[in-house]
Each structure stands twice: as structure tokens, then as C-alpha cells.
Amino acid sequence: MSEEKKTEEEITREGNPRKPQGEEGKVMLDRMNHSHYEVTGWALAHWKIKGDDQILDIGCGGGMTLHRMTEQLTTGHATGVDYSGVSVEETGKLNEAFVKEGKLTVLEASVEKLPFKDDTFDKIITVESFYFWPDPQANLKEVHRVLKKGGTFLLVADVYQNGHLTEQQKKNITRYELFNPTEEEFREIFQIAGFAETVIHTRDGENWICVEGHK
């Protein structure tokens, strides 16, 4: 069966996290909450979340990153968006208490057209989703649009093009058609998107990258 003829649920069963669907998608999202935990914690250490921050998580997946950020808020608010309805559902379940408190909102939406006004958020993050963005350059401009002046955007990934990828990582990049830039390519697309400064963090012994864009 060709990739084009496979349903989203069939692709999910094969392990592609592009858009989790069905019961297999729920299992995948739970696995992501655990497998992304360490790289996310490392990336979040580059931020200082303030109690009154307005935060957006793009591609919120299973909702663990939102949970970790929202518990640091007092008068602030966190919003998660994902174009997978299953992800929105699972994020809401994991963060049910925060949703009821009014500290967290979860929406089904795409990075292609974020349903927010210009200059809405102090901080924006995306964890392990940038590979799948349909038009990375245009989508970065959309992120820049909804970020407040003086705000920061964190792009977090546990693999990037650095010359040290494993054979399995290379196969996955090809198989799932992942967008996987080098450090210099990241700097270039962030600059074109309008970010005033781009800081890149990497971790020795890992293929992790955290691209920090300042507006």
C-alpha cells in the first residue's frame, strides 16, 4: 500500500507522529509525554517563566509541556493548539484542572493560520513538531506575528542536521519527509521570519537543539 493511500490512523500505527489519530494516536501521545520529557526540560531551562506570562504551545501533542509551564503561572494564561483532534482531547484530559481554573485553553488549530491577534503572547514554544510544518518559512512568520515585541519563541527538537545522525534517524527523516535544517539554516529562516535575534542551544552528546528567537 502506498503512503498516499494510507489513512491517518494507518500512518499513526506505523509510528509517524505527524498527526496522531484514533486509539493508537492516544497511545502514541502518552509515549511522547514521556519520551520528550527530558529534552523539553532542558529547553525550558533557557526560559524564565513569569507568573503573569501569556504562553502558547504550538503542536501541544499529549499536553505534558503545557502542564509543566502552566503550573508555574499565577495570573497568566497558557494556550495549546494542535491540528490533531485527538491531541486536543488528550491535552484537555491531562490538564483538566487547569482548564477548569481558567488558566489553560486548548484549541484545534494549525500553525498555518493561528487564531490570535498580533502581539498576543509573551512566550511561544513548539516541541518536536517543527519537522512537520507544511511551510516552515511562512509558518515562522505566523509565529512571529502573534508574539509580543520583546517576547521569545523556543523551537525544540531532539534531532537536527549536524553530521552526527544515526542511521535510524536518517531513515526516519527520509521516510516521514521531515524538515531538518542545520544550525545556519535555522538562523537564516528565523531572520527572514523577522526575529531580531536568534540564539541556538545544543547539548553535548545529544542531537538536541533549542532555537531561541527574540522579537
What are these regions (language model features)?
Residues Q54-K113:
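Class I SAM-dependent methyltransferase SAM/SAH-binding core
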Residues K123-D135:
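A short SAM/SAH-binding and catalytic strip from SAM-dependent methyltransferases
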Residues H34-D53, R68:
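Conserved alpha-helix/loop element of class I SAM-dependent methyltransferases that forms part
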Residues E112-K123:
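A short acidic, Gly/Pro-enriched loop at the edge of an enzyme's catalytic core
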Residues K6-N33, T152-E212:
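C-terminal alpha-helical "lid/dimerization" subdomain adjacent to the S-adenosyl-L-methionine
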Residues E38, M64, G85-V86, Y131, ...:
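Short alpha-helical
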Residues Q137-K149:
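A short glycine-rich, Lys/Arg-flanked "PGG" loop and its adjoining helix->strand segment in the class I
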Residues D52, L147-F153:
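Short glycine-dipeptide loop
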